[in-house]
């Protein structure tokens, strides 16, 4: 009889995050996540779960860190591959919305729905993610004058805030519709309105 494969601490931690993500996407994803529920889904005792993560807050922080690292790695690569400002902004927005569509459980974290019963520091951590996204847009918009010799009719910070608000609005609608209304739905039509900012 084969012995069960012993997983490393890193593999176990990743398993916990994968299970938690699936739970957030499930029908019970809006319910409070308890360590007992998470441990049961992972197939370990609560005591064992705490060996992988000292608290539930740390699990959520790890999820946010992972999604942020993944998205901003892709955003950095996209910016390197494209020099035109409008195309850069379009590609980033499309990437962010596509990420949300493919990761509904994580989108519940970004909207704050999954964090309603959790530590306030997690809401602050999500706010940092959106602040970083806004700063990325500001930098790209401000570079337009140097790259293309053109400015905007509005302050770059105002435009960047609007772009982030649009992303957040798509996330909220996606979660509110129980993931039926895709984040990508009607984006290209909405982009045609935004495109006028770059004329």
Swiss-Prot record:
InterPro entries: Homeodomain-like_sf, HTH-type_Tx_Regulator, HTH_TetR, NO_SlmA, SlmA-like_C, Tet_transcr_reg_TetR-rel_C_sf. Belongs to the nucleoid occlusion factor SlmA family. It comes from the Bacteria. Homodimer. Interacts with FtsZ. It is found in: Cytoplasm, Nucleoid. Its main location: cytoplasm. Required for nucleoid occlusion (NO) phenomenon, which prevents Z-ring formation and cell division over the nucleoid. Acts as a DNA-associated cell division inhibitor that binds simultaneously chromosomal DNA and FtsZ, and disrupts the assembly of FtsZ polymers. SlmA-DNA-binding sequences (SBS) are dispersed on non-Ter regions of the chromosome, preventing FtsZ polymerization at these regions. Keywords: Cell cycle, Cell division, Cytoplasm, DNA-binding. This is Nucleoid occlusion factor SlmA. Residues 11-71 form the HTH tetR-type domain. GO terms for molecular function: sequence-specific DNA binding. Pfam families: SlmA-like_C, TetR_N. One of its GO terms (biological process) is negative regulation of division septum assembly. PANTHER family: ACREF/ENVCD OPERON REPRESSOR-RELATED, ACREF_ENVCD OPERON REPRESSOR-RELATED. The keyword GTP-binding does not apply. One of its GO terms (cellular component) is cytoplasm. Disulfide bonds: none annotated. Residues 34-53 bind DNA. It comes from Pasteurella multocida (strain Pm70).
